[in-house]
Structure formats: structure tokens, C-alpha cells
């Protein structure tokens, strides 16, 4: 999901987060945050594009899985907060559901996979944990899968 989304944005010269962020309902309780994002697309666009590409690659390879899963979940949570159509105060449902939509499901799955350390099963994190650098700096294990 992340890799495909990031690559499609990267290959589209007209893509900008400003288009999405500028069209949010005014009643969204987080409108000030997303209005700030919309005014800073020179920073936000590369963060979204390259973030999605790197998150996608890292999840596929199983490298720095916990950190990557957390980063992906946080990005999904921001997308979820932006998805309130009319805002919570203006009523529900949000698109595709009452409160839970596909974006929230992705975020919860990523939090769960990161908490379980899924990168250790078949990912590169299994090999990275055996590296002498990780033995020297044990805190690195918290970033690995």
C-alpha cells in the first residue's frame, strides 16, 4: 500500500498534498493543523511521498520494522484525522464507516505488527539483530522488528 501510493505520487508531477488538505470541511476539529500543512506543501509533499516510499520498502524488506510500522501508523492516523467529513461535532459517519474506516484499520494493524516485532519473522531485522553494532548498542533493538 505505502510503496504503491508513494510511487504513484512521485511519478505524478501535478500531485500535491495541498489539493487534499485544502478541501477539508471547516468543521473538522483538526482544520487548523491541516490548514498549516496545506500552507507548507514544500515540506509536507516530500515528507508524504518519500515517507510512503521508504515505509513501503522497509515494511517489505522487514528492516527497522518497529520504527517503520510506527511511522506508517502515525501517517495513517493523520490521514484518518483528516477524513472526518464535517467533523465529529457535525456528525458521523466518516467516509466508508461511522468512525472506523480503512485508514484506521491500516494504522491499528501497523501498531500491532510493530508491537509484535513482526520484522523478526522473515525480515532483515532478524539478521541485523545479530550484528555487533546492535550488541554494542542494545537500544537499537527497539527500532528493529
What are these model-derived regions, one by one?
Residues 26:
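Substrate-binding/active-site groove segments that recognize
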Amino acid at each position: 500500500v505505502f510503496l504503491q501510493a508513494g510511487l504513484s505520487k512521485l511519478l505524478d508531477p501535478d500531485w500535491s498534498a495541498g489539493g487534499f488538505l485544502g478541501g477539508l470541511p471547516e468543521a473538522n476539529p483538526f482544520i487548523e493543523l491541516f490548514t498549516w500543512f496545506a500552507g507548507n506543501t514544500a515540506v509536507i509533499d516530500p515528507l508524504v511521498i518519500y515517507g510512503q516510499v521508504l515505509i513501503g520498502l522497509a515494511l517489505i524488506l522487514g528492516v527497522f520494522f518497529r520504527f517503520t510500522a510506527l511511522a506508517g501508523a502515525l501517517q495513517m492516523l493523520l490521514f484518518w484525522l483528516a477524513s472526518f467529513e464535517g467533523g465529529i461535532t457535525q456528525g458521523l459517519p466518516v467516509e466508508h464507516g461511522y468512525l472506523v474506516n480503512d485508514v484506521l484499520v491500516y494504522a491499528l494493524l501497523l501498531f500491532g505488527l510493530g508491537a509484535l516485532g513482526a520484522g523478526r519473522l522473515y525480515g532483515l531485522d532478524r539478521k541485523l539483530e545479530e550484528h555487533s553494532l546492535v550488541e554494542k548498542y542494545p537500544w537499537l533493538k527497539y527500532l528493529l522488528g
